């Protein structure tokens, strides 16, 4: 994983290009990502940078975590994440420092990871886009049922992975190869072309795209 930023999904809006084209964008606030620890091969077995984002009341911070953050000289945040980096990049960073939007540039391809909106218990039509039954013509009380879930006495069981009703959403998902349409360095905002996972105020992780195609 490359060095990235932890941010907050503000919401969606649209911006206009110089040609007058409207582009739907998601606004991501990537305020101060405070460096809490630099991990190295010698001390931890791998190289990474650990960062915290947001704010948390002191009464909500455990004593071990408070000591860990005090060692780095940073305030407690809502979330702590780490990014795997190489030794050369780790040498440029230090605990107590911060990361900002200058890690990215306009037009760059990125991956955005977040927790999708929870939909609760959902049927197969909403969950897997099954077709509903006929409204009339002999159909009664079977309009939204999934239909048969198995065969006969042989095999006499429902195969694992059968698509059925159940919990929908509230899972971690990554959308790849999104494009940064605009950067507001003063307000520490990334305007990402398209939609990203999660609800408003949800925490997201922004990293350089791992499958970005080289420009011809």
Swiss-Prot record:
Pfam families: Ribosomal_L3
Cellular component GO terms held in the UniProt record: cytosolic large ribosomal subunit
Post-translational modification: Methylated by PrmB.
Modified residues (N5-methylglutamine): 153
GO molecular function, one term: rRNA binding
Annotated region described as Disordered, given as residue ranges: 134-153
Keywords: Methylation, Ribonucleoprotein, Ribosomal protein, RNA-binding, rRNA-binding
InterPro entries found in the cross-reference section: Ribosomal_uL3, Ribosomal_uL3_bac/org-type, Ribosomal_uL3_CS, Transl_B-barrel_sf
GO biological process, one term: translation
Signal peptide as annotated in the record: none
Presence of the UniProt keyword Ribosomal protein in the record: yes
NCBIfam families linked to this entry: L3_bact
Function field: One of the primary rRNA binding proteins, it binds directly near the 3'-end of the 23S rRNA, where it nucleates assembly of the 50S subunit.
Family, similarity comment: Belongs to the universal ribosomal protein uL3 family.
Quaternary context: Part of the 50S ribosomal subunit. Forms a cluster with proteins L14 and L19.
The protein's name: Large ribosomal subunit protein uL3
Organism, scientific name: Cupriavidus necator (strain ATCC 17699 / DSM 428 / KCTC 22496 / NCIMB 10442 / H16 / Stanier 337)
Source taxonomy: Bacteria, Pseudomonadati, Pseudomonadota, Betaproteobacteria, Burkholderiales
Protein's gene: rplC
């Amino acid at each position: 994983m490359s060095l990235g930023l932890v941010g907050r999904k503000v919401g969606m809006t649209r911006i206009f290009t110089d040609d007058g084209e409207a582009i739907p964008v998601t606004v991501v606030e990537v305020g101060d990502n405070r460096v809490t620890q630099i991990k190295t091969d010698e001390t931890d077995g791998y190289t990474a940078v650990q960062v915290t984002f947001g704010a948390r009341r002191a009464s909500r911070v455990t004593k071990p975590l408070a000591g860990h953050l005090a060692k780095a000289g940073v305030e407690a945040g809502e979330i702590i994440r780490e990014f795997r980096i190489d030794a050369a990049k780790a040498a440029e960073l230090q605990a107590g420092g911060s990361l900002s939007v200058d890690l990215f540039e306009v037009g760059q391809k990125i991956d955005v990871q977040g927790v999708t909106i929870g939909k609760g218990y959902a049927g197969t039509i909403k969950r897997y886009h099954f077709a509903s039954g006929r409204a009339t013509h002999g159909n009664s009380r079977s309009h939204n049922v999934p239909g048969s879930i198995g065969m006969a006495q042989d095999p006499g069981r429902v195969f694992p992975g059968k698509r059925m009703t159940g919990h929908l959403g509230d899972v971690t998902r990554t959308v790849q190869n999104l494009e940064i349409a605009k950067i507001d360095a003063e307000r520490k905002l990334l305007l990402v072309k398209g939609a990203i996972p999660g609800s408003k105020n949800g925490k997201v992780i922004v990293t350089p795209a791992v499958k970005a195609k080289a420009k011809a």
